[in-house]
């Protein structure tokens, strides 16, 4: 179904250990954010601002509560909209150093989002994109979009794919 899957704590830990050195004074876009755990973790590890995009009202409420609990509201913007409308709204207004997305598996949504990002003005030049996807997800199209897969971290049932903009 389309329900949100929590990214497990271990996965989250691994993810942030892999990018920890870079989380400085930067901006983080959390797409299909679910509970907001990833974006909130990013803020707590030094990101200047995180933008959360989520369409599900229950998930939005969860993000708001988690931000309140962690007292990180000042560094967060929550957009309740589908990802593509949100990207259009942000395009030209904001640039991101990190984009994390955890789309529903097996709907090819990551490809649609990456295709949009490739022609948008949303990415800083050394931006890192991280996609959480099922192990079967095909990423062979990345190079045509001008992206480079730098790393794949496989877990039991899913993986994190680290993508950069080609120089």
Which residue ranges define each predicted feature?
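Class I S-adenosyl-L-methionine-dependent methyltransferase catalytic core
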Residues: 1-167
